[in-house]
Design a protein with these regions (language model features):
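Surface-exposed helix-capping loop/turn segments at secondary-structure junctions
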Residues: 75-78, 170-177, 222-231
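Catalytic phosphate/metal-binding cores of nucleic-acid and nucleotide-processing enzymes, i.e., regions
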Residues: 49, 180-182, 239, 246
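Polybasic (Lys/Arg-rich)
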Residues: 202-242
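Mg2+/Mn2+-dependent nuclease catalytic core
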Residues: 100-215
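Short, polar/flexible loop-turn hinges at active-site or ligand-entry regions and domain interfaces
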Residues: 48-50, 148-151, 227
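Short cysteine/histidine-rich zinc-coordinating motifs and their immediately flanking basic loops
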Residues: 43-44, 247-249
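Metal-dependent nuclease catalytic cores that hydrolyze phosphodiester bonds in DNA/RNA
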Residues: 1-132
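Cys/His-rich metal-chelating microdomains
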Residues: 35, 242-245
Length: 249
C-alpha cells in the first residue's frame, strides 16, 4: 500500500493563468466544499479507491463495437432499436476526448472568467442528421431492478453528462440537450457462470441543463481564494469520519 502523503503538485494558487479542473473535482465540490478545498488548495486528497477493471473492460468493448459502426457511418443496431436517429460521431479528436491516448485530460476548455481549464473524459458522441451532438456515457451495472436514472447516486451521472455538454458547447459544437446513457446490465439469472458474463443493453435518455455549471465554477473560485476552510457538508462521510475520530483520540 502506498504511504499517504500531502500532495505538493497541482495545487491552486491565487493567481494562476489557468488551473486544470476535472469533472470529478466539480462533483467533489458539490458533494463537500471542505473536501474539495483540502484536496485542491492544501493537497490532502481523499483516500484512493481501487479501480473498476470489469467496468473498464465493458467500456473498452463497447467503444470497440461502436467504433465498428463509426467507420461505416451507420447506427448501431441498438440505436435503431430505440429509434435514435444518429450515428457514432467521426472526428479526429475523438481519441483525445475519450483519452485513448492516456493523457488523463479528455475534452477541455478554459472558462475565461475563472481561469479554470475544465476537463472531462467522455465515452462516446453520436451525431444527428442535423449535425447536433449527443453526449453518450456507458455504465456497467448488475441489477434485477428496472434500469432508471432516479436513484440518488445517479444524479451524479446527470451532472456528469451536463458538464460534458457544457464543455462541448464551449468548444464550439452544436450540442443537443438530449444525451444518452448506455447501461450494460450483467445478468445474474443464469444457472452457471461458464467463464462468461452475459449483458443486456438498455439506453436511457437525459435532457440536460448545464446552466448550473458556470455559477458553480464561480463559487469554486471563491472558495479556493479564501484562506479558511469552508464548512463541511453535514452528509459528507469523509468529514464525519474525521470528526468522530477526533472525539476518541
Amino acid at each position: 500500500m502506498t504511504k499517504y502523503k500531502q500532495r505538493k503538485r497541482n495545487l491552486y494558487n491565487d493567481n494562476p493563468d489557468t488551473y486544470a479542473l476535472s469533472r470529478s473535482k466539480i462533483d467533489m465540490f458539490l458533494d463537500c466544499p471542505r473536501c474539495f478545498y483540502l484536496d485542491r488548495k492544501l493537497g490532502f486528497s481523499q483516500p484512493s479507491m481501487p479501480g473498476w477493471p470489469l467496468n473498464s473492460a465493458v467500456d473498452h468493448l463497447l467503444k470497440r463495437e461502436f467504433d465498428h459502426y463509426r467507420k461505416l457511418q451507420q447506427p448501431h443496431p441498438i440505436m435503431v432499436q430505440y429509434g435514435i436517429e444518429a450515428v457514432p460521431f467521426l472526428h479526429p479528436d475523438l481519441p483525445i476526448w475519450r483519452d485513448d491516448v492516456y493523457h488523463y485530460v479528455g475534452a477541455s476548455v478554459v472558462e475565461e472568467q475563472t481561469g479554470f481549464q475544465v476537463q472531462g473524459i467522455i465515452d462516446d458522441i453520436w451525431v444527428s442528421p442535423q449535425g447536433e451532438l449527443h453526449i453518450v456515457d456507458y455504465k456497467a451495472t448488475s441489477t434485477a431492478s428496472e434500469i432508471s436514472l432516479e436513484d440518488e447516486y445517479k444524479q451524479a451521472y446527470k451532472r456528469q453528462m451536463e458538464i460534458y455538454q457544457w464543455i462541448f458547447r464551449r468548444i464550439g459544437f452544436k450540442v443537443s440537450p438530449v444525451g444518452y446513457f448506455v447501461f450494460a446490465n450483467a445478468l445474474k439469472d443464469r444457472t452457471f457462470f461458464e467463464n462468461k458474463l452475459e449483458f443486456e443493453l438498455t439506453i436511457l435518455s437525459h435532457y440536460g441543463d448545464d446552466s448550473w455549471v458556470s455559477p458553480t465554477l464561480f463559487e469554486m473560485k471563491k472558495v479556493l481564494e479564501c484562506d479558511t476552510l469552508p464548512d463541511a457538508n453535514p452528509e459528507c462521510e469523509y468529514c464525519e469520519y474525521r470528526r468522530l475520530i477526533k472525539e476518541v483520540e
